[in-house]
């Protein structure tokens, strides 16, 4: 009998922000998939979950290429999929750890799409997204009343960024490290700097 595949959001970095359901799934798993990039040793998601790991847990590191287009390196993704399916076919429950929430700008989304047509039981467990944690961290409401809220990837086209930020009452711009100077300039040109907050590694 095949095992169950769990996608677990470990939140923004503080192990105490994991949900009770996430902790129970981690404790019950036979195997943990710890995603990492080619350029870095170890897995940030794994380190966040480490306080809840049982001693005999099997840990499998998988490298996920940081590419804009999934098709650019589909071979690596297919290899990871095959490894996960092999573990599930052994009857093992496999938990895939991911930062923040599994269904929000997450590597897990691609893994989920690869497995959802493979007759696999999939359980996705939500986590706290970084921008939600930031509101509490800096003591600023993210959105209130009838405000319109937008989430924008920092990699979006500059004109698109400006267009969305002009109509949103509040916005979270994610992953700004590639073009932070352009985004700060945009905020200045639109007189938004007084209300803006720049946060790095919010939960770490």
Predicted regions and their residues:
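General beta-strand structural signal in soluble alpha/beta enzymes
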Residues: 34, 61, 96-98, 124-127, ...
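Short beta-strand segments
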Residues: 7-9, 97-99, 152-153, 173-175, ...
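Class I S-adenosyl-L-methionine
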Residues: 1-15, 20-22, 27-121
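A short acidic, often aromatic-flanked loop/helix-cap motif at beta-alpha or helix-coil junctions
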Residues: 65-70, 157-159, 204
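Class I SAM-dependent methyltransferase SAM-binding "motif I" and its flanking Rossmann-like core
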Residues: 103-167
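A contiguous loop/helix-start segment that scaffolds small-molecule binding in enzyme catalytic cores
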Residues: 5, 165-204
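Solvent-exposed alpha-helices and their adjacent loops that cap or buttress functional pockets
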Residues: 1-2, 24-25, 88-89, 96, ...
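Short gly/pro/ser/thr-enriched loop/turn and capping motifs at secondary-structure boundaries
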Residues: 39-42, 67, 129-132, 180, ...
């Amino acid at each position: 009998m095949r095992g169950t595949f769990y996608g677990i959001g470990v939140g923004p970095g503080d192990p105490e922000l994991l949900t009770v359901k996430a902790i129970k799934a981690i404790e019950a798993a036979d195997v943990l998939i710890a995603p990492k990039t080619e350029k870095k040793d170890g897995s940030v998601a794994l380190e966040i979950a480490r306080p809840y790991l049982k001693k005999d847990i099997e840990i499998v590191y998988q490298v996920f290429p940081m590419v804009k287009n999934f098709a650019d390196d589909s071979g690596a993704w297919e290899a990871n999929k095959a490894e996960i399916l092999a573990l599930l076919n052994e009857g093992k429950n496999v938990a895939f750890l991911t930062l923040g929430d599994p269904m929000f700008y997450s590597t897990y989304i691609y893994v989920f799409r690869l497995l959802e047509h493979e007759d696999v039981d999939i359980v996705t467990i939500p986590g706290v997204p970084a921008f939600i944690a930031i509101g509490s961290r800096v003591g600023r409401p993210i959105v209130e009343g009838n405000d319109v809220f937008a989430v924008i990837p920092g990699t979006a086209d500059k004109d698109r960024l400006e267009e969305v930020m002009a109509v949103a009452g509040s916005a979270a711009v994610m992953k700004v490290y590639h073009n932070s100077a352009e985004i700060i300039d945009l905020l200045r040109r639109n007189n938004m700097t007084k209300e803006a907050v720049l946060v790095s590694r919010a939960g770490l």
